[in-house]
Swiss-Prot record:
Keywords: Glycosyltransferase, Transferase. This is Purine nucleoside phosphorylase DeoD-type. A purine D-ribonucleoside binds at residues 5, 180-182, 204-205. One of its GO terms (molecular function) is purine-nucleoside phosphorylase activity. Catalyzes the reversible phosphorolytic breakdown of the N-glycosidic bond in the beta-(deoxy)ribonucleoside molecules, with the formation of the corresponding free purine bases and pentose-1-phosphate.
Amino acid sequence: MATPHINAVEGAFAETMLFPGDPLRAKYIAETFLENVEQVTDVRNMLGFTGTYKGKRISVMGSGMGIPSCSIYATELIRDYGVKNLIRVGTCGAISTDVKVRDVIIGMGACTDSAVNRLRFKGQDFAAIANYELMNAVIESAKVRGTKIRVGNIFSADLFYTPDPQMFDVMEKMGVLGVEMEAAGLYGVAHEFGARALCVVTVSDHIRTGEKTSAEERQTTFNDMIIMTLEAAITL
């Protein structure tokens, strides 16, 4: 039952999926943390895998960069393959001065400069929010592991290279914790099709201070976030 962008067979995906942007990161997660792994899709090199974590069937697949790419895959995964829980795992740039590099942010809501949710909501402003059950599961997992997390609004940008850096001042004033490029679209798709979605990101760099993590630091922090998220996933 291939779709235009996914060539997996029916039943290839688990109900719960980790959803990083980078397909090679999806491959890394599958090979590092899952058992009994099978690659189930590879259209346009957007790799997807299904395996088990502590006995529970889990899938992981790349979403690509930006809301349009993420929305295409999320739509087909939910609508055509029956995925019910999509957890984006990725990185973001911090805005607020009290958010530090290597912090883990849970996107309770996602502001955006994209018009996609207005298009699906008859021109009105749709509140793109995470699913409470998914969010609570990850928060509880973080508590058990002693992982420091921040919970709040993030911003999903259409442009990586913004022409208006003054917008960062507005974001900070409004309490936005970090900037990424997918969550608002993912949340909109999930609400449209009756699925559950959450965005969990690590701070890889600070837009205000210019501080960045090293490759080694990014990997260590990312691994901690993935384990925390997988531990939450097996409770769903």
